[in-house]
C-alpha cells in the first residue's frame, strides 16, 4: 500500500485518487446544463437512495450522503436547495466538555410525491416532506 506523507499527514494514495475522482465528478455535475440532464446523471450514477419519475433537480450540486435521500415522483427542487443528512454540533459540545460524550447526528430525508421545494431551502436530517407540499423559498 503506497502512502503519501509529509511532516504532519500520512494518506493512502488510493484515498487521494478517489478524492480527485469525486471532485471531478462534482465539477462535471455542476456543468450539466439542464435539470433533466442532472436527474438522468443522478439516476445513471445511482447517487441517491431513490429517485422517482418526473423530478426536476435545479441545484448544481448533490449531497455527499445521497444514499440517505429518497425523492419520490413529481418533485421540483429549485436552485440552491441543500439536503443535509448530518450535522457537526457534537464537535462543539465535545470541545466544551473536554471529552467525547456526544455522537454525530445522522439521519435520512424523504420527499414524497407532488412536492415543490423553493430556492435556497435547507432540508435537515430525519425530515419527511409529505405529499402535496410546498416548502417556501429560503426555509
How would you describe each model-predicted region?
Residues 1-48, 90, 132:
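Terminal amphipathic alpha-helical/low-complexity segments used for targeting or macromolecular assembly
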Residues 14, 44, 70-72, 139:
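Intrinsically disordered, low-complexity boundary segments flanking structured domains
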Residues 51-53:
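Cytochrome P450 catalytic-domain "roof"
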Residues 38-39, 56-129:
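Flexible, glycine/small-residue-enriched loop-and-beta-strand segment within the central core
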Residues 49, 115-117, 135:
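Generic detector of intrinsically disordered, low-complexity, polar/charged segments
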Residues 132-139:
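Short, intrinsically disordered, charge-balanced linker/junction segments flanking boundaries
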Residues 55-56, 135:
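Hydrophobic, membrane-inserted alpha-helices
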